């Protein structure tokens, strides 16, 4: 299932340009949709209500529901992970409450290519200070990882940068769920862990597209898949988990974030 990335070394310039054009357009749709989702969410809404809105918006904006294309179909258009749920949260009928932590992870399919992005927010206006700090540190770790991206950089450079920020912030580092390449498939080579050693791992090439997605927790990093949904990943100690993500293009002299909003 892990396909090689399309890059300048292995593909024609036309093929690389086609990929970049499609992923820029799809990424912009995704970024704008997640921006609007952040404004849409409020206490009292259920996961299934939010999921229905997201599904409608994906279609309205001209993209495809990526999770409908999985071999083992996910029960929703977006992953919604509340409180102790870390990632892959299946939408439920439980209403969100003031102060809940909720992570949203969304893949889109557009013009033959996938893009992927995630963010974590606190519902309403009441924020637990420790949870608020976790969100800030985790997002900072993502941007520190992104700053390492350029031709010739190693995957280990990214993981090392992410890990250092998370550990300095006294957060648990999730190691069994990681970032990945993306393009014609949702998950492609290379794997992009949130830990690593500088100078180790796959060496990035101009035209590569990867997802950098730190995951952290306030407690110990052990986690499990909830048997009720067979999808939702929860923290074993019941602590709060956090997740953020962007799709990144390796450019000739650095990087471009494809999933930013306007």
Residue spans for each PLM region:
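Active-site neighborhoods and metal-handling regions in enzymes and metal-associated proteins
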Residues: 1-262
């Amino acid at each position: 299932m892990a396909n090689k990335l399309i890059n300048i070394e292995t593909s024609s310039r036309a093929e690389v340009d086609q990929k970049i054009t499609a992923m820029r357009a799809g990424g912009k749709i995704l970024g704008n949709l997640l921006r609007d989702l952040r404004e849409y969410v409020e206490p009292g809404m259920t996961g299934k209500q939010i999921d229905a809105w997201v599904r409608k918006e994906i279609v309205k904006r001209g993209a495809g529901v990526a999770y409908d294309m999985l071999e083992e179909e996910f029960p929703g258009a977006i992953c919604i992970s509340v409180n102790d749920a870390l990632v892959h949260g299946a939408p439920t009928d439980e209403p969100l409450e003031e102060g809940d932590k909720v992570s949203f992870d969304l893949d889109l399919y557009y013009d033959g290519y996938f893009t992927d992005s995630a963010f974590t927010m606190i519902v309403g206006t009441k924020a637990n200070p420790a949870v608020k700090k976790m969100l800030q540190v985790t997002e900072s770790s993502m941007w520190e990882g992104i700053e390492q991206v350029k031709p010739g950089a190693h995957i280990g450079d990214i993981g090392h940068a992410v890990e250092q920020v998370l550990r300095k912030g006294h957060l648990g580092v999730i190691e069994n769920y990681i970032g990945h390449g993306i393009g014609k498939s949702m998950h492609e080579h290379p794997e992009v862990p949130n830990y690593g050693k500088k100078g180790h791992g796959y060496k990035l090439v101009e035209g590569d597209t990867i997802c950098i997605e730190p995951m952290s927790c306030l407690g110990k990093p052990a986690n499990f898949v909830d048997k009720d949904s067979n999808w939702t990943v929860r923290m074993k100690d019941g602590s709060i988990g956090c997740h953020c993500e962007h799709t990144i293009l390796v450019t000739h002299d650095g990087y471009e974030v494809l999933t930013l909003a306007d």
